[in-house]
Amino acid sequence: IIDVAKVKIGDNCQMAPNVSIYTAGHPIYPDTRNSAFEYGKEVTIGDNVWLGGNTVVCPGVHIGDNVVIGAGSVVTKDIPDWSIAAGNPCRVIRKITDEDRRKLFHNEEIDDEAWDMICA
């Protein structure tokens, strides 16, 4: 985490290995950038967010509550609540709905025995 500005991380977040969160930025134009000027923009990650491995979160991004970010994503813009998003640049793929309650990767479902333990 490069935190020249605030980084707010909500409750019950999961981050896989090699997640990077950056708040720092530099000017685009070379002469201005060479002045060593640096700025920071706050990053906010909501509650119940899962960031897949090797995800990069860029300065100024707000990730809403109950979001899944796919592995290898580069998050350059805000992601709304209840979204599955992935890619470079990261884009919303779809909303998370009640139909996803028992879903695993590639639309597999949690088996009944495991589901009973989760619900206990």
Question: Language-model segments: which ranges?
Answer:
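Short beta-to-alpha loop/turn elements within the nucleotide-binding domains of ABC transporters
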Residues: 61, 73, 79, 88
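Nucleotide-sugar donor-binding loop of glycosyltransferases
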Residues: 25, 78-79, 89, 96
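Short-chain dehydrogenase/reductase
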Residues: 50, 68, 74, 84-86
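Terminal amphipathic alpha-helical/low-complexity segments used for targeting or macromolecular assembly
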Residues: 89-120
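Flexible, glycine/small-residue-enriched loop-and-beta-strand segment within the central core
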Residues: 1-62, 96-97, 102
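Conserved catalytic segment of ABC-fold P-loop ATPases
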Residues: 64-67, 80-82
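Short arginine-rich
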Residues: 77-82, 112
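Short alpha-helix at the nucleotide-sugar/activated-sugar donor binding site of glycosyltransferases
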Residues: 14, 67-68
